UniProtKB/Swiss-Prot annotation:
Keywords: Membrane, Transmembrane, Transmembrane helix. Partially overlaps KNS1. It is found in: Membrane. It comes from Saccharomyces cerevisiae (strain ATCC 204508 / S288c). This is Putative uncharacterized protein YLL020C. The lineage of its organism: Eukaryota, Fungi, Dikarya, Ascomycota, Saccharomycotina. It comes from the Eukaryota. It is a multi-pass membrane protein. The chain crosses the membrane at residues 35-55, 66-86. One of its GO terms (cellular component) is membrane.
Length: 101
């Protein structure tokens, strides 16, 4: 019976907490690990911005190379915050699969 209740959450975009299905609106706050990850991403982002300003034009690392890597690193926090904002059911289902096993 308990496993059936767990499986009923599958594909609904809700996650399981203490054996109950909770929708994203019922989950209050973010886990501490998520907050530390967000804090780390924001810190790394601003360190990159500072490096971009500080790097002189005649240094070994050209600005075009740096901007190329910098623009790709911007995608990491973008997708991270996107998943937090919209609570994609795909990611909840992945964690649900681990929970059932």
């Amino acid at each position: 019976m308990n496993s059936i209740r767990k499986l009923s959450c599958f594909g609904t975009g809700s996650s399981i907490y203490s054996g109950k299905c909770l929708s994203s609106t019922q989950q209050k706050g973010l886990p501490q690990r998520t907050l530390w990850t967000m804090n780390g991403l924001i810190w790394a982002y601003w360190m990159m911005v500072l490096q971009l300003i500080i790097i002189p034009k005649d240094s070994g690392c050209s600005r075009s190379t740096f901007l190329f890597f910098f623009s790709h690193l911007l995608l990491v926090p973008f997708f991270f915050f996107l998943t937090l904002l919209f609570h994609f059911p795909v990611f909840n289902n992945i964690s649900l699969n681990f929970y059932i096993q």
